[in-house]
Amino acid sequence: MFKSSTVALLAAVVTTPCRAQSTAAPDAPGPIVVTGQRDSLHLDTATDAGSRLRLTARETPASIEVLSQEELQLRGLRTARETFNDVAGAIAGNVPGNPAVVSLRGFSGNTVSILQDGVRVSASTVVQRDTNSWHYDRVEVLKGPASVMFGEGALAGVINKVTRKPVLGERHLDGLVSVGSFDTVFAAGGINLPVSSTLAVRADASYQRSDSLYDVDNNQSFSAGLTGSVIFRPSDALSLLIAVDHFEDRYDATYQGLPLIPGQYARDPSDAVTGAAGLVADKALRRRNYNPQGGFSNADETTLRSRLDWRLGGGWTFALDLTGYTADRAFVLTDSQSFAAPNAAFLNGSFRQSFQDFRHDHQFWNARGVVGNDSHVGGLRNRFSLGVEYNYTDFKTLRQQTTAAALPPIDAFDPRPFPVPAGPGIFGALDVMFNSRLNQTSVFAEDGVNLTDTWLLVGGMRWDHIELDRETVTNATGVADRNRPTYDPVSWRIGTTYDVAPGVALYAQYTTAVSPVSSILLASIANTRFELTSGRAYEVGFKVSDTSGRLSVTGAAYRIEQKDILTRDPANPTLAVQGGRQSSQGVELTAAIVPVKALRLSGGVSYTDANYDELGEGVAGVRVDRAGNRPINVPSTTLNASALYTLDGDVTLGGFLRHASAFYTDTANTIEVAGHTVLDASIAWRFTPQASLTLRGRNLTDAFYGEYSGYPSTNVYIGAPRSAEIALSTHF
């Protein structure tokens, strides 16, 4: 029902003309043409991810990157994963249980928080899906710890997806339709309508289906979104926004990555991955899918939220956010493959597999109130905010898993998937229900004082009181294990920004953060008995732009430290204890330049030196020291660059480059994924002022490369092969 209604709405949006009553809204870009002068790195834009003081990115003593909807379309970033992968210093992968999971500044998974409109529902590895990027006005990225803003988990950074909002007094209609390789079809549309001088509504819909975005066998995918909102502003002092967001996705026979096999059995071995015992990535297995018939991963989530903004006078403001969220998710797939050498039954070799059936029933409620003031104290401008936040989460998850011996083997080169196994007996003791209820109350404050017109000092603090009621029930016996831990972490930061010259700002900050040893909602009973890990970070940097807006450059150097991660007891290697340490240090540089009106160049480069400073791992009952090793899925160097050139005002040529250096899939650093470089290109023709046609090629060199590691270290996600698409975009 949702699919058909979405398609009908999109058809209407894309084909129906609409008379413009005023200039286009900032979040509704028309057909893309390089225009030259602009704030290319959004340094003078206030962000919700960086502060609640309404500081601009230039004023904030931290590294902030913003990708606008226009930039998402220019670069052909269709989904959340593609968007996150384009952030300087980040890589992202589509692990089935953690779609669009991010690695940033030497850390990954739960240490990177992902928000929607400034609200963190749960750990990113629980809630994030590879949603269509059409629905976002912009994506804000705060790099480095942000627990002082958003609580536990935000150690490496925060990604805030800001949805499109209504604009008063404007009427416009936008559409985007594309078709491409692997039978991929995408359609999206949005409409902004003024109801009166004080009331406006906006609705956006998107639909994407593909035989497989990665060109993998039996891996059909579908994703759709429907977002709508209404804004009521009876006066300049008062506004109320009410919004609803709904997203769905489904991936058939979910791709778990390419399993590595011993080199002597490979038909077309590659150097994309090298591993212990001669394991290689065999190109002959590039499209193979070993999931059972009927296997799938899907999510169905709905968010209802409201935002009240009230200017009280005298520089005082009040904001109230209310959010309700509900989601159902399923993960029915084979989660690992173990290679067996050829024998009489399987001349090509075979895989033994384990199978899982995981389900999520997730409810979340949030209320946040913030009082702010922007005035002068002692002759100095002072911006202040004080807030209280309450979250309640009810999370139930059925977790059923087999051993590898419970399933029949499958041919490595000619897999004939078996049906999804049935019957509760196949799971045995690995059939449990996790019930989690989480109450969290937070108090936070920020203050920013201008010591001079060019010198800003910013500080903040947050206290969280977290109550977890965690129960694990073994379904076969009804036996329950329970724990009710509480946590009371305090996070804080202090930073300063100094304008040394017009358009040139230097900054420095020190900040702390906390993060659980694993996702709070999915942690084992044993892991809930551990304290939260603690982190701290130092960062210095600069932000530069010229008065014409043609040149913007930012740079940062940082060090992040995390302590009390899980390690193994030296006296008893079978026992997990806290006491491990992990750190990263690095530099980042982003730049955007418009040397002539028709040409725009932009890019970002990062270098990260990340290590386990203290970590012991249990191997066959023995504690093995992993100190000095690099964390999983952390490349030392990343690079992204783009060039856009407009010919005669109507045709724009684009080139886009992404590079990531080698990374490891295991803490032992025995399996290395080689570095890779991917080149995309586009040509866009604006054939009317309201419409443009774009031809885009992806991975033009048809590079065979690993982009991320999944759950088992011997499975690596292979990037999508060369593909092409053609897209029509309209704006009325």
Q: Predicted segment positions?
A:
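Extracytoplasmic beta-strand/coil segments of soluble accessory domains associated
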Residues: 44, 48-57, 61-64, 69, ...
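Acidic/polar loop-and-plug regions of large Gram-negative outer-membrane beta-barrel proteins
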Residues: 208-210, 220-222, 226-233, 237-309, ...
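Outer-membrane beta-barrel translocator/receptor signature
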Residues: 134-137, 148-228, 234-238, 302, ...
